[in-house]
Amino acid sequence: MRTLALLAAILLVALQAQAEHISVSIDEVVDQQPPQAEDQDVAIYVKEHESSALEALGVKAGVVCACRRALCLPLERRAGFCRIRGRIHPLCCRR
């Protein structure tokens, strides 16, 4: 019975070590891949001393805006347009 428990413990330790190795390998692969701007939103935080170009669009200081791929989210309004890799997207700001 002790032998069976010892073998089970050794098996569990070996499986855990293998799982950690796989996890590290996956993290390395994810780190090596370049981020795809087309699949991500770009957040913009407007400070008081920033350029007045966004203020001209009605965006006030302290507002968080994002360059969205498609439509603005329900609690956002379109404040203008932005570019990601040359493509024009809506600039959405929280209300």
Swiss-Prot record:
Location(s) in or outside the cell: Secreted
Chief localization: secreted
PROSITE patterns named in the record: DEFENSIN
Signal peptide positions (record): 1-19
Disulfide partners: C65-C93, C67-C82, C72-C92
Domain of life of the organism encoding this protein: Eukaryota
Entry annotated with the keyword Transferase: no
Transmembrane segments: none
Propeptide: 20-62
SMART domains: Defensin_propep, DEFSN
Cell wall biogenesis/degradation recorded as keyword: no
Cellular component GO terms, alphabetical: extracellular matrix; extracellular space
Keywords linked to the UniProt accession: Antibiotic, Antimicrobial, Antiviral defense, Defensin, Disulfide bond, Fungicide, Secreted, Signal
GO biological process, one term: killing of cells of another organism
Physiological role: Host-defense peptide that has antimicrobial activity. Inhibits corticotropin (ACTH)-stimulated corticosterone production (in vitro).
Family indicated by similarity: Belongs to the alpha-defensin family.
Full protein name: Defensin alpha 4
Lineage: Eukaryota, Metazoa, Chordata, Craniata, Vertebrata
